[in-house]
A protein has these predicted regions:
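A contiguous, low-structure linker/loop signature
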Residues: 2-51, 72-75
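Active-site loop segments of alpha/beta catalytic cores
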Residues: 13, 22, 45-299
């Protein structure tokens, strides 16, 4: 989340009113206070002080930066959009209450999702006015997977979460011609056919340590219909493996996920301080030495 303030005790309060603390030596902030936790009603949601999506400071210099990348580099221009609806509603309600709403209070669940998405869509619409004609990829992240399962059953996902994701992907296509990159950690194998139907072009981060997220399975079932972005394990391999093991896994991923194209080499998630530098170098140097086995050109 952007904006916010540092509280006297060192915690960070963001523009949504969510308070976080950053543990020593960690690259992540951890949730500490959820402003809409507990017993609330749709009226409480309507009265909540939402961020101002029209604040011009959000967009200052945005077009200039995108234009420079487009005209002066050979990079793809990626816009990191703010459509983290599941995340943000979890942060506002707290995980326990969010799951209770998902299971038993659908009116409240939808009221919060509607309010949050309205703010996010206006933020992004204003951004697209600045850079919608320049971006090659619109990326957004919203975790709907856990280590061993999705956040909810497939029928519940389709009833309560997918309709909002459809509004998001439609919003992106309405304002840009960009490819859509979607980030979700965890075991989301069951949802991938729906992601494809929604028009998502690439899935990140391919958490290979999660259940049913084996690269072979994903490439066999979904290769050619969605691209994969990630796959180098950050839970076990990078922090605990040897440089030789990292290099071997990168080569294997080129053979599996990279076969025929449709894969971007990347670590599954942020590389933490306990990862030996030698392993980071092994990942990048091996990646540079490998070649994608692209699909054969049509005759």
């Amino acid at each position: 989340s952007g904006g916010g303030e540092i509280l006297p005790d060192g915690r960070h309060k963001d523009e949504w009113g969510v308070v976080r603390v950053r543990p020593e030596g960690c690259h992540y902030y951890e949730l500490d206070e959820c402003p809409l936790a507990g017993e609330i009603t749709p009226a409480d949601i309507a009265r909540y002080p939402w961020p101002d999506p029209t604040d011009p400071g959000r967009f200052r210099g945005l077009r200039e930066r995108a234009k420079r990348l487009k005209e002066e580099t050979d990079y793809a221009v990626v816009f990191s959009a703010r459509y983290h609806l599941v995340h943000q509603t979890q942060y506002l309600r707290g995980f326990e209450d969010w799951y209770c709403d998902l299971a038993g209070d659908h009116d409240l669940f939808r009221a919060l999702c509607d309010a949050v998405l309205e703010v996010m869509m206006e933020m992004n619409r204003r951004a697209y006015e600045e850079v919608g004609d320049l971006v090659d990829i619109v990326a957004f992240g919203d975790d709907v997977g856990l280590q061993d399962r999705p956040v909810c059953s497939l029928p519940m996902y389709r009833k309560l979460i997918r309709p909002y994701q459809e509004r998001i992907t439609d919003h992106i296509r309405r304002h840009t011609n960009a490819k859509i990159l979607y980030h979700t950690c965890g075991s989301v194998y069951a949802y991938i056919p729906d992601f494809i139907e929604l028009g998502i072009d690439a899935l990140n981060p391919v958490q290979v340590s999660a259940k049913n997220m084996e690269p072979e399975r994903l490439k066999k079932e979904f290769g050619g219909r969605i691209a994969f972005w990630g796959g180098v394990d950050t839970q076990h391999l990078l922090p605990h493996g040897s440089p030789e093991e990292v290099a071997a896994e990168v080569r294997r991923l080129f053979e599996v996920l990279g076969k025929g194209g449709g894969w971007v080499l990347a670590a599954v998630h942020n590389i933490q301080p306990d990862v030996p530098p030698e392993n980071v170098l092994a990942m990048y140097e091996t990646g540079r030495s490998c070649v994608y086995e692209t699909a054969a050109a049509p005759a």
